[in-house]
Amino acid sequence: MKGQNSKTALAFALAVAICLISCNDHAAEKAEEEIIESAIDKGVEKLEEGLNIVFDKARDYYKEITGTDTSQVPYYERLEIPQSKKKLKEQVVEHKGYTVSYNTTWLIPNWVAYELTDEEVVGQISRADKFVPDPDIKGRCSTTDDYKGSGYDRGHMAPAGDMKWDAKAMEESFYTTNICPQNHNLNSGDWKELEEQVRDWAIKNEKVYVVCGPIVKKNYATVGANNVAVPDSFFKVVLMYRDGNWRSLGFVFANKSGNKPLDTYAKSVDEVEKLTGLDFFTILPDDIENEIEKNGSFEEFER
């Protein structure tokens, strides 16, 4: 009996020892796993820090050699930039105060787009008044000589009056990529009145988004040695945010004398899209875009 008890005690002690060894092995394995995981986490953190440093230095270097701040939103992701429903002959150039899609056949813009804030409206930079070819255009570009004796004004699309906030923006507004042959009375009359109205909207609403440009018919006339296309008409669409809601409105002006109230030129953005083949304000959610682009009422837009 005594011998039997000794054997039982020995077996129990052996089982306990095996259990302790097993538990210790498991604890050791778990500790080892935790050490490895911690090392991996620290390694990933160091790698991320290193990559961020590399990317920051690359971004700074790129900005230094090109003058371009890559932290800014690309032009094609900005709210005011339209999309074309058909293939355009174009060079798209970003300037300080506006972006232009320049038609390399017509030698006038397809469209000019910009954002205008209330602070920009009250700028004090003097008017440049010197038209020059756009240095960023590759290939042919219209010149101011093309307009001499043509009977047409050099009509701004993005107006100089909207660029008084910066000397460079003002200078670039006089690039010939930003002008079209425009009837004098329209340029100095109803078109100018709309420009002033847009500035007023910017002041009242802190910011507006503007897209404007020519509408060119198939059998268009030309002016100058470079055969610059004469538009049949001009469009402008405006987007603003007021009282928690987006609002949009379009305008179309025939390239001739008018002297009419602005509301007679008002159209829905949908109508302007049909005339131009452009799709405006595509960054907005579809339900909002579809709803606001139905409005063609000047009064409703201002309400």
Predicted regions and their residues:
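Bacterial N-terminal signal peptides
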Residues: A11-C19
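Domain-level detector for secreted/extracellular nuclease and nuclease-toxin modules, and
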Residues: G3-S6, S22-R303
